[in-house]
Amino acid sequence: MKYAAVLTTVAALASRALGAGVSGTAEGFASSATGGGSATAVYPTTTDELVSYLGDDEARVIVLSQTFDFTNTEGTTTETGCAPWGTGSACQVAINKDDWCTNYESSAPSTSVTYDNAGSLGITVNSNKSLIGEGTKGVIKGKGLRIVNGVENVIIQNIAVTDINPKYVWGGDAITINQADLVWIDHVTTARIGRQHYVLGTEADNRVTLSNNYIDGESDYSATCDGHHYWNVYLDGSSDKVTMKGNYFYKTSGRAPKVQGNTYLHAVNNYWNDNSNHAFEIGSGGYVLAEGNTFADVTAAVEDSSFEGELFSSSSDADTCSSYIGRACKANSFTNSGDLSGTTVDVLSKFKGETVATADTASTAPASNAGQGNL
């Protein structure tokens, strides 16, 4: 009887492993990402196992079925930081990372900061990995993920990354991509993050798709001191093609996204809800095609004062898109929000011949479809 029970358990575990895998395929620029492919799934049970699986050289399908809490695993640091945005209880304060306070905010009041060291640098993710959450169980708390230094072919789907030193700017990012290729992030929830929810660094990040993610900006602390997170999506690569489709931006106040460097961004069917400052910030080298997006209660859909890039988002010229991407563009929708009007046709030429995501009519669907647990 005991032998039979063991066999039953082994068979169940094997069936579970074989049944695990990525749901669907990416749209847009990272459409050929396969991650860990058909590798037999592994189920880490400790933070050390998770770090090992993500960082080794094997193609892997890694399934998260619990919370991995990195808080206090690397100790804490208490030192002097600064308060550039005010000393109110709802204001973020800054760590003096790389002498940032000293060099850039020397006139800001000094303040004592105590932060968790684990959040400062994310977990290294190597090539050919699929990181998948089981239901709503897969959570990484207190530490982010880093896809950097030549890594390629990574899929992250249906997990949550949360609680990375939310009081402290420079306290850590949720997902960092820098000098990488073929990265698909899908149905991921990020919440209560000190710095960026997503950051694509200054090296070439090539082909990236961010789809159906929930950027939850609600926080007790923010740089705008109003419970709306300012640091959200920062796209700064030297040769980047990014598809951003079906994402839900909630309670943000800026950099949602910030686009510059040499970045082609196709922003399609996203939903911005309750933004107290601005959504898009388009700097030099940012080329944005924005269509089928919904803006509700967004003070400014784009920040005019910093605009140095190029934008096509015109509903009146939507048919112009046909000559470049093979179909008319979808109109953006605005409710109690600033407008997003850009007619730079040169942007469309950047997307000609590229793998461009499909577009639906603008809607609020991402509010119920995006993030962990909504596959």
From Swiss-Prot:
SUPFAM superfamilies: Pectin lyase-like. Disulfide bonds join C82-C101, C91-C225, C321-C329. Residues 1-19 form the signal peptide. The keyword Transmembrane does not apply. Optimum pH is 6.0. Stable over a wide pH range of 3.0 to 7.0. It is found in: Secreted. GO terms for biological process: cell wall organization; pectin catabolic process. Glycans are attached at N128. Its main location: secreted. The active site is at R255. InterPro entries: Pec_lyase, Pectin_lyas_fold, Pectin_lyase_fold/virulence, PEL. GO terms for cellular component: extracellular region. One of its GO terms (molecular function) is pectin lyase activity. Optimum temperature is 50 degrees Celsius. Stable up to 55 degrees Celsius but inactivated rapidly above 55 degrees Celsius. It holds the Pfam family Pectate_lyase_4. Pectinolytic enzymes consist of four classes of enzymes: pectin lyase, polygalacturonase, pectin methylesterase and rhamnogalacturonase. Among pectinolytic enzymes, pectin lyase is the most important in depolymerization of pectin, since it cleaves internal glycosidic bonds of highly methylated pectins. Belongs to the polysaccharide lyase 1 family. This is Pectin lyase 2. It comes from Aspergillus oryzae (strain ATCC 42149 / RIB 40). The gene is pel2.
